[in-house]
Amino acid sequence: GHCGKTTAFKRTQTLKCVLYVAVEQGWIDRHPFLAFKCAPDYKPRVFLSDEEIQRLMDIELRYHRQRAVRDMFIFCCFTGLAYIDLKNLTYDHIVTTPTGEQYIYNRRQKTGTPYHIMLLPIAQELIERYRGYPGKIDETRVFPVKDRKSMCTTIKRIAQKCGITKNLSTHI
């Protein structure tokens, strides 16, 4: 089948790594792909305007699940957290300084890189809104995060209701 440039790049990189091992082990004499060049096809990032974020925050949603997905998306917008880091976020990761500022201290799951994020009032409000909320993996979790696919589908529907034509996902 056909695959995109980024997928082709990732598969080529994997194959190149295997071939390096093959040369090192003496299974082949030389690396056949040394001169082969391939680059991923980077897509430009999509950003929401302040007005679009406000529309998402203001829209009346009938169902609890829709409101929760919208709120988690807004939280990610104001913190920059990736889906998996949102899913893994627990109350233990939230620290209040002596001056009253709140921060998230944790490590990115994808890279293991430590991070700390100062929480703006909107993010703090969302954390409090979901304290004691049913449907979480366990009570230590901050948000009732479900699978990524259903979150993406739901946020796309909400964006459509708001008249936002940008292709939203948990990556934005």
Positions of PLM-derived features:
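Basic, Lys/Arg- and aromatic-enriched nucleic-acid-binding interface segment
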Residues: 2-14, 24-83, 87, 133, ...
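Hydrophobic (often cysteine-bearing) scaffold residues that line and stabilize catalytic clefts
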Residues: 7, 11-14, 68-69, 119, ...
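DNA-binding alpha-helical recognition surfaces that contact promoter or target DNA
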Residues: 10, 17, 88, 153, ...
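Alpha-helix C-caps/helix-loop-beta hinges
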Residues: 18-21, 25, 92
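Conserved hydrophobic residues forming the short capping helix/wall of the S-adenosyl-L-methionine
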Residues: 23, 131, 159
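Conserved tyrosine-mediated DNA breakage-rejoining catalytic core shared by Y-recombinases
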Residues: 37-46, 50-52, 79, 88-129
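C-terminal catalytic core of Y-nucleophile DNA break-rejoin enzymes
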Residues: 42, 109-128, 136-157, 163, ...
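Active-site-proximal segment of tyrosine recombinases
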Residues: 85-87, 167-170
